[in-house]
Amino acid sequence: MTIRKMTELNITEKRILIRSDLNVPIENGIIQSDARILAALPTIELALQKKAKVIIMSHLGRPKEGYYTKKYSLFPIFEYFKKKFNNTKIYFSNNFLDGIKLNPGEIALLENTRFNKGELNNDEQLSKKYSDLCDIFVMDAFGSSHRMQSSTYGIGKFVKIACAGLLLISEIDALKKALKKPKRPMVAIVGGSKVSTKFNVLNKLSKIADTIIVGGGIANTFLAIDYKIGKSLYEPDFVFEAKKLRDKYNIIVPIDSRVGKNFCKNEQAIIKSPDNIKEDEEIMDFGDESIKKIISIITQSQTIMWNGPVGVFEFPNFRKGTEMIAKTIANSNAFSIAGGGDTLSVIDMFNIKNNISYISTGGGAFLEFIEGKKLPAIQMLEENFKNKSK
C-alpha cells in the first residue's frame, strides 16, 4: 500500500480540505459523545500549527440527500469547535460549493456532506466541486472509508494531492499490528446479533486468532447446532455454516447463559445450561461459568481484538458478561484493539477508554478491513498517488 501521508507534505498556507468523521450522537442539539471528534482533533491541530487554511467536512446521520434537516446539521459541532479553538477564527458554511476564502490559521467547518445532492452516489460534478475547494485533500475519516461517495472517494480523481491524515494512518497501523503479526496467543471476541453480518469476519479471524469467543445472537446460532434454545434470537439459515466454522476452528461458545422470559429492562435473570432452556425462555447474556472460562482465556492472551457486546448490556440483569469481559480487557497488559458502534458504547459505559490500547472509530470499515476487503478510500489514495506521481 503506497499512499501519501499528511505529515510528509508541506501544507503551510495551503488550502487543506480534511474529510473527518464527526458522525457523533446528538440529541436536542447536545453532543452525547465526543469520542469521534476527539479522534479527529490531532489532524486538525497539526494543520493549524502549520498555518494552513483549514476546511473540514463530514457527514452526520442519514438525512434525505439534497435536503437540509436541522436534526442532522453540524452546527452543534461548530459550537464545540468554537470552544475548543477559542483563539482561532472559525466559520460555519452551508453554502460552500462555489468556494471559500480563508486566511492561514483559520478554520471553516462545512455543513453536512449528505445535504449535497449526489454525495451518496459519488456524483462526478460534486466531487469536482469538492476538489476545487482545496490544494490538498486529507482523508481522515476511517469510519467512512468503506463508502464510495463523493467526499470519501470521488474527490480523489480530481484533486492534485490526496493524502491520509493522522487518524487514518493510526487506524491502519493498529489493525495491521493485530492482524499481520499478532503476539501470541491471540483472542478475538465477536458479539452482536447476527452471524450473517459477521460471517466473513469470523471466517477471517478464525484463520488468524488462536481462539474466537462468540457472544450475543451470534453465539446463539452456534448453540443451535446442538441445542434447542427456546425463543432466543438466532439465524436458522446460518446454523450449518456456523457448524463448519466450529468444527474447523477453536470457537468458544457459552457453557451456561443468563436467560429470561421477557425482553425488558427489569426482567430477572436465571442461569441455565444450554440443554435446559425452556421454549418460553431466551438467552440474553453469559452465565457465570462461561464468564470464568472467558476471563481465563483473555488473561492469558497477548493480543485481543474485540467487536461487539456479548449480551443485552442495556439491561442491568444481563450486563455482567459484557462488563466482566470489558474490565478484563482493560486490566490486561496485552495489545487490545476494539471497534464497532456498540463496542464504543460499552467502553463509554464502563469508562475504560484509557485502558484499551487502540479504539477504532470505524464500524463497517473496521469489519471490512478485518475481512481483507480493499476500502474505497484507501484505493482512492493509492490511485491518486500513482496517477499524480507520473
Swiss-Prot record:
InterPro entries noted in UniProt: Phosphoglycerate_kinase, Phosphoglycerate_kinase_N, Phosphoglycerate_kinase_sf
Chain residues that bind ATP: K198, E314, G340, G341, D342, T343
Top-level enzyme category: transferase
GO CC annotations, alphabetized: cytosol
Listed pathway(s): Carbohydrate degradation; glycolysis; pyruvate from D-glyceraldehyde 3-phosphate: step 2/5
Signal peptide annotation: none
Enzyme Commission code(s) on record: 2.7.2.3
Catalytic activity from the UniProt record: (2R)-3-phosphoglycerate + ATP = (2R)-3-phospho-glyceroyl phosphate + ADP
Localization, UniProt: Cytoplasm
Coiled coil: none
Molecular function, one GO term: phosphoglycerate kinase activity
PANTHER family: PHOSPHOGLYCERATE KINASE, PHOSPHOGLYCERATE KINASE 1, CHLOROPLASTIC-RELATED
Name under which the protein is recorded: Phosphoglycerate kinase
Organism placement in taxonomy: Bacteria, Pseudomonadati, Pseudomonadota, Gammaproteobacteria, Enterobacterales
Gene name of the encoded protein: pgk
